Amino acid sequence: MRKKIYFLLCLLTISLMSFGQANDPLVSNCVMNAGANARYLKDFRIQLGKATTQGEPRYKANMSLWKNTKYRFTLCNSEDSKGQLILNLKDDTDKIVASSFDQQTGKTYSFIDFLCNKSGIYQLNYDFAGGQQGSGVGVVSMIK
């Protein structure tokens, strides 16, 4: 009888502890903005102060992407951000293969779709336009 009570007590404790992190509303909204045909894979929370010099993006992360898979990179800013969150996606040769910022028009896109032509490790480079300070979220999804 004691073993059953102990087992039930352990089971109850584990089930109460198994709840994940509290939902971040910015992440939740950004996942919803990715679209109904997008399957969430990962998010990156970015918080940066004002840059002292312009140049290389200040937040870098690596991610493995698979050939013949279409990905959507969704970018969301918090309300108090001074600049717009931008993403440059680089392949293993350090070549930019996709960007949310069009240098010719100066337009920043809230998401970009990328069809991966070569499996490998890709570098996600995040920053805020003009080196401004801000916080935001980058969500990576797979398109069905």
Describe the predicted segments one by one.
Residues 59-69, 113-119, 143:
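Extracellular and analogous surface-interaction loops
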Residues 77-85, 130-133:
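Extended, low-complexity, turn-rich repeat/linker tracts enriched in Gly/Pro/Ser/Thr and Asp/Glu
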Residues 130-143:
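Edge beta-strands of jelly-roll/beta-sandwich modules across compartments, strongly enriched
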